[in-house]
């Protein structure tokens, strides 16, 4: 099975709408990256119903560690930096999108994270 994971910073105390927007940015950007580097994974994921899981971290440091590990493993990903026009400081790192890719490859990096 294939999935996409979105990891959101919980320490920024974004409103629900803001979190949803950041998750969407991460999802779309990771999807576009996956289309370039792993089109077959995208095809399988699309055919399987586009499973997504949204997880949380509690700091920028944790978010960057996830992003680093995902890159080391060669998974399609995105790192989202907010423009800062509404709730948070400009340039704040808010989310990481991972995949779509095989669940076991993603869970290797995200297995210790909790659901948002």
Swiss-Prot record:
Keywords: Cytoplasm, Hydrolase
A GO molecular-function descriptor: peptidyl-tRNA hydrolase activity
Predominant place of localization: cytoplasm
Annotated compartments: Cytoplasm
Keyword Cell membrane tagged: no
Annotated catalysed reactions: an N-acyl-L-alpha-aminoacyl-tRNA + H2O = an N-acyl-L-amino acid + a tRNA + H(+)
Superkingdom: Archaea
GO CC entries: cytosol
Keyword field contains Hydrolase: yes
Class of this enzyme: hydrolase
CDD domains in alphabetical order: PTH2
Function summary: The natural substrate for this enzyme may be peptidyl-tRNAs which drop off the ribosome during protein synthesis.
Protein name according to UniProt: Peptidyl-tRNA hydrolase
Protein source organism: Methanococcus vannielii (strain ATCC 35089 / DSM 1224 / JCM 13029 / OCM 148 / SB)
Gene field: pth
